[in-house]
Each structure stands twice: as C-alpha cells, then as structure tokens.
Amino acid sequence: MKQDPRFPNLSILNHPLIQHKLTHMRDKDTSTRTFRELLREITLLMGYEITRNLPLTSRHIDTPMGPMEAPVIAGRKLAVVPVLRAGVGMSDGLVELIPSARIGHIGVYRDDQHRPVEYLVRLPDLEDRTFILCDPMVATGYSAVHAVDVMKKRGVPDENILFLALVAAPEGVEVFQKAHPGVKLFVASLDSHLDENAYIIPGLGDAGDRLFGTKN
C-alpha cells in the first residue's frame, strides 16, 4: 500500500496480485465473463487489504483440544454498499470475504453534465456499523462524493466510511478529497487524467458495460 503526497486520504493498493489482475481487466480483448471473474477476485484481494486495521477483541471459545481466548473483530458490524450499477460486481468479492456483512445499494447515474443523479437508496441499519462503499471508477468524483453524502446525511461519521475503487483520475480524487477529507479512499491505480468525455485515461473503459456486456 502506498500514498500520494497530493492526496492524504488516498491509499493505492499496489499488491502484485492486484496489479496483475488489473492489467488483465484493462485489456480491451478481455471477455465479459473473464472481466466479471477478475472484478470479483481483485475486489476480494482489495477487501483483505482495506480491512487489515479493523480492531480486534477476544472471545472465549472451546476448540477440540480445550478452551481459549480467540481474536474476533471488535464492536462494529460491516456493510457493503455498491454504487449502482457497476459497483454490484465488486460486492460479490467483498461478501465472499465477509459473509456476515449486510448489503445496501445506492443508485446514481451521471447526467449530460457528468453530475450525479440519485434514483435509489437502500441501506441496512446504521448504528455501530462500518460501511464499505464500492464503485470501480472514480472519474469526475461527483458520484463518489454523492454516495458519501448519502451516508453522512444519515449520520454516519467519516471514520465509519471506506470507499473502494479500482481506478481513479487525479481530478476525481481532488474533488473527493475537498468534499470529504476525512473519508479514506482506496484504489488499485491512480491513472493519468480524464479525457474530454470524462473517461479515465488509460483506464479500463466503461466498467458497467464491460461487466454486463452492454453497449453505452
């Protein structure tokens, strides 16, 4: 995991397996089926990285050989909240890693001005819960900012929100950081820039279309 001095709340997950899988996802010749499988796999690996600092406590259990005090995640419950539609492909890997996690959904699309339009919010109970929001791309940053706005307006504090993405543009990370400097953002890659159509360069194309096999 490495940092970028420009963006204090950004962590880049540079594990070799994550980078290897991301390269295959970027390849335009990767099939929809393979892209979907890679998205699940890379999200599982990224989930392992971002949860490494969850606090632990101990619980008394009995093993086949006798009693012991064993570590378990302390206090906070976990929830996975994909940003529709492409975020759904990331939730599978996270739930595989954390089977007890609750699942919510935030539906957002970008209008002609690349501004977020909300059409759905479904969340589990918020009390004493850490939320992992996921969306493959942070391009302009507006959808990510809006998704975090949804959580904070409902009283979820910054420290209980983690945002997970595969690829981000510096422009989007800057927007996100200005809006939510206390929310941690985790990505597999910070790419070069946005083009005139607000696509990430070099990016991986439209993640939703590649995941579902649709045309934009």
Curated annotation (Swiss-Prot):
Catalyses which reaction?
UMP + diphosphate = 5-phospho-alpha-D-ribose 1-diphosphate + uracil
Query: Where 5-phospho-alpha-D-ribose 1-diphosphate is bound, by residue?
Result: 85, 110, 135-143, 206
Q: Which cofactor does it need?
A: Mg(2+)
Cofactor, free-text remark: Binds 1 Mg(2+) ion per subunit. The magnesium is bound as Mg-PRPP.
Q: Does the record's keyword annotation contain GTP-binding? A: yes
Pathway the protein contributes to: Pyrimidine metabolism; UMP biosynthesis via salvage pathway; UMP from uracil: step 1/1
Going by the UniProt record, its keywords in alphabetical order are: Allosteric enzyme, Glycosyltransferase, GTP-binding, Magnesium, Nucleotide-binding, Transferase
Domain of life of the organism in this record? Bacteria
- Which Gene Ontology molecular-function terms are recorded? GTP binding; magnesium ion binding; uracil phosphoribosyltransferase activity
GO BP of this protein: UMP salvage; uracil salvage
Name the Pfam families on file. UPRTase
Q: What does this protein do?
A: Catalyzes the conversion of uracil and 5-phospho-alpha-D-ribose 1-diphosphate (PRPP) to UMP and diphosphate.
The entry sums up its family as follows:
Belongs to the UPRTase family.
Q: List the protein's name.
A: Uracil phosphoribosyltransferase
